[in-house]
Amino acid sequence: FGGSTASELDINDEALQREIAYWWATQTVAPTYTSVIKGTPMEILEIVQQMDANGETYSIGIYKEDGSGGHAITPFGVEDKGNGLFAILVYDNNYPGETRELYVDSRDNTWLYEASINPQVQSELYTGNADTQTLDLTPTSSRLDTQQCPFCDGSGISSVGGKLAAPSLQGSQINQI
């Protein structure tokens, strides 16, 4: 796509936009959506620690406890910081070129990460514990499988038709069935 790092890519490149849209869309359908692993901070940490051994890679979904925000980051390692504190090393596309750390405290099964939903928004502290279920993992392998089309089998709206109604410039209604 014309860059040696993600931050060097031209966001206006149509082929790149299509690629980004494809990978984003995979998160909404099976098998990707049904392969998401939800867990406590310690369960998520343990899976990330096994990435090299099991050959799988993941994206981590982080969510605000009130559901008002979320973001995906890419883990690539774990550091033991001592005293029960671990740092999951991540790539965050909102901070290109930086190694970021999602902290997991094994003493109370909590996590925290400072993030923003996009680079133009002030960062906030995302936190959670074993009860909040605000961390998840999406296996990369599930995104490489053929994705299921939720409306192609005739069970979606396309099988029963739909109605579109829009006002004309003169104020009357135009209908399409």
Model-predicted regions and their roles:
Residues 36-90:
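Active-site-adjacent substructure of cysteine-protease-like catalytic cores
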Residues 8, 14, 19, 43-46, ...:
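Glutamate identity and glutamate-enriched acidic tracts
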Residues 67-70, 79-177:
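Cys-His-centered catalytic/binding microenvironment captured across papain-like cysteine peptidases
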Residues 1-42:
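Cysteine-nucleophile protease catalytic domains, especially the papain-like/related folds used
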